[in-house]
């Protein structure tokens, strides 16, 4: 099944190329545009990527612990709300989906850091 050429050209215009390559297990800092009334500001959301979905057109899920509560946020790759994504560190994992981290607390939820280029 191939994509219609018109749809393919449209997708190429919409797709973002400024996002770094990251995989589940990487810790990323996502700068999110927040609009409050007339003002617009950037808010950082830093956490572990626990899932990527549907390739280039898809989304990724970031999880962090805030004041003892787990917080997950799903970001579409082509969202206008995302200002930038920075990869902070990489970790060694053997799964594509890290949903098991939801049930772990404290030291058990740590991931082993690894050097990647």
From Swiss-Prot:
Q: Which domain of life is it from?
A: Bacteria
Gene Ontology biological-process annotations:
translation
Q: Which InterPro entries match?
A: Ribosomal_bL19, Ribosomal_bL19_sf, Translation_prot_SH3-like_sf
Q: Which UniProt keywords apply?
A: Ribonucleoprotein, Ribosomal protein
Has UniProt tagged this entry with the keyword Transmembrane helix?
no
What family does this chain come from, according to its entry?
Belongs to the bacterial ribosomal protein bL19 family.
What SUPFAM superfamilies does its record include?
Answer: Translation proteins SH3-like domain
GO MF terms here are: structural constituent of ribosome
Q: Name one Pfam family in it.
A: Ribosomal_L19
What is the purpose of this protein?
A: This protein is located at the 30S-50S ribosomal subunit interface and may play a role in the structure and function of the aminoacyl-tRNA binding site.
Kindly state one GO CC term assigned in the UniProt record.
Answer: cytosolic large ribosomal subunit
Signal peptide (from-to): none
* Originating species: Acidobacterium capsulatum (strain ATCC 51196 / DSM 11244 / BCRC 80197 / JCM 7670 / NBRC 15755 / NCIMB 13165 / 161)
User: What is this protein's record name?
Assistant: Large ribosomal subunit protein bL19
């Amino acid at each position: 099944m191939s994509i219609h050429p018109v749809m393919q050209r449209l997708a190429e215009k919409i797709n973002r190329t400024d996002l770094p390559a990251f995989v589940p297990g990487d810790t990323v800092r996502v700068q999110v545009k927040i609009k409050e009334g007339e003002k617009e500001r950037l808010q950082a959301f830093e956490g572990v990527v626990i899932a990527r979905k549907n390739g280039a057109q898809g989304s990724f899920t970031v999880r962090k612990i805030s004041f003892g509560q787990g917080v997950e946020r799903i970001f579409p790759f082509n969202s206008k709300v995302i200002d930038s994504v920075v990869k902070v560190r990489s970790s060694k994992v053997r799964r594509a989906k890290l949903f098991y981290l939801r049930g772990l607390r404290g030291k058990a939820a740590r991931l082993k850091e690894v050097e990647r280029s």
